[in-house]
């Protein structure tokens, strides 16, 4: 039976470039979608740029252009990058669209009518010059505890104390430099706590399509933490409003109030699909009505599970729509075992990869070969990337066609022999459903291992039958024809198995094979007495120099981007000079993160269990806003001040040092990287 499926990837934010971390998710999604289409299902893949919020508004102001102009330009760049990697969206839209405005307002009205919206008066700091309320990270001032200057509105980077912006001494706006005022403002809250019973049932439930869980096991465990046990819930109501000026959609009947970006961003899935439906004549309501029998899957990063597994299903359900069939999260991408680094050139943008002339299908294959159905981080090891692509794709796969096609063209007028009874091909067709199940369940790594095992069998058959020797022997034409026809058929089957991962190679192979297109049926059916075309080379080897040039290009692009910022004086002024003796008092050491977790009762602190080599310590750091998924820091090397006096962190415990981080221009805190080879306890200086 033909399935009706809607699939989405998380929406990239419209203020930065697409990098390989983004590509992990979009490759994972695209492979699954292409597999469904190969099987003949009606599968629609929709995405969009996430365009609203303060960062976009301020970025456009810095460029001196309207936000609408900036997001239009960014969308073109994003779509070009994704298209370059053969991501086959059926629609790539924008959250700044009439459809999204209508859906956001309709959902809000439905939630309000259902008693799930409440207004409350809150206090916030206000910039009188810019006439805007200021988020925590847009307020700076003097730390109320250690009196360090120029500290952010949520925590002190010198002593680690956390506080509210209203506690800062002599606060000023990071946007205009003026002194902010404390003002009251009416905000609107989605009463998420009242949705707990539904969410407990949905998060622990199974979808009606195949009985599989809505969430992965790791995600479900996290939801249980957030939802609480029994009748109690730890869910907080969600502030869904922001004050003008704000780039976004105005809340109905609330002039000057705008939807927070995380309300209208997931609604963007609906808007993109509605835009597609109107163009191709699909019934939108069939997919989103409360009793829909269609399927809807969201592929996301593990850092946004909270929004997609709690807010989004609750918003949909209590506004009269269906909830997702499944939400599938993936881990983060590291490069050579470490977080992507701009200084090392491993923060690789999609654009730089394409501009350096690397084949995007090399990366599609390598990423897919690392992915499974679990929420696990994956590592791009650049040496392994070179060897795996060259060995698997060039050495094992395309080489099969190259070794057989010439004989078919020269000796048999380009026509195959009927080899339907081939034992070799029977081995390949026998794996069709098993490999299909691997794709279906997102076990891509296993699927590709099994496919390469079949390629090994085919290559063993080549070596055992030696068509190049058969071609020299009298009376062996029929056997040569049979062997080469088996090899071309085997190549066709392998191409069909690999088509979700290598769509462009599959399309080029279809031309060579004289087929309209490769489908999943090609994993089972032989070609018969079929005429093929002249073989054209399908894939080149990866060269070490190409990878070296890619890394160097990313280093240079970062340096070039940093230069104007320095010239324009965008960095904070350098603090007053310190003597050498002052510096030598600070004992900075490398430490390994054994465990990092959120601190119950604090929205700002993370608790680090650290190994300093010579001893283990606990340090609290106010960087929770920058690392919403603290477990991702486990195993990472950090730099910490080892001789900082222990300090009591309110009710949370004693912090035995201070972890160093950098404050970025967008108000985030980023931990400092430690280069390869450094060990816990090593002195920094």
UniProtKB/Swiss-Prot annotation:
Quick one: where is this thing mainly located? cytoplasm
Q: What class of enzyme is it?
A: ligase
The residue numbers the entry assigns to motif 'HIGH' region are 12-22
tRNA-binding domain location, by residue? 582-685
Question: What does the entry list as the binding residues for Zn(2+)?
Answer: 143, 146, 156, 159
Positions that bind ATP: 342
User: What cellular component GO annotations does this protein have?
Assistant: cytoplasm
UniProt cofactor note: Binds 1 zinc ion per subunit.
Report keywords, A-Z: Aminoacyl-tRNA synthetase, ATP-binding, Cytoplasm, Ligase, Metal-binding, Nucleotide-binding, Protein biosynthesis, RNA-binding, tRNA-binding, Zinc
Motif annotated as 'KMSKS' region, chain positions: 339-343
**For this protein, what is the EC number?**
6.1.1.10
Cofactor(s) the record lists: Zn(2+)
Subcellular location(s): the record lists:
Cytoplasm
Task: Quote the catalytic activity from the record.
Answer: tRNA(Met) + L-methionine + ATP = L-methionyl-tRNA(Met) + AMP + diphosphate
Q: Which GO terms of type biological process are on file?
A: methionyl-tRNA aminoacylation
In Gene Ontology terms, what is one molecular function of this protein? metal ion binding
Which protein family is named in the record? Answer: Belongs to the class-I aminoacyl-tRNA synthetase family. MetG type 1 subfamily.
What the protein does comes down to: Is required not only for elongation of protein synthesis but also for the initiation of all mRNA translation through initiator tRNA(fMet) aminoacylation.
Q: How does it assemble?
A: Homodimer.
**Name this polypeptide is given:** Methionine--tRNA ligase
Q: Which gene name belongs to this protein? A: metG
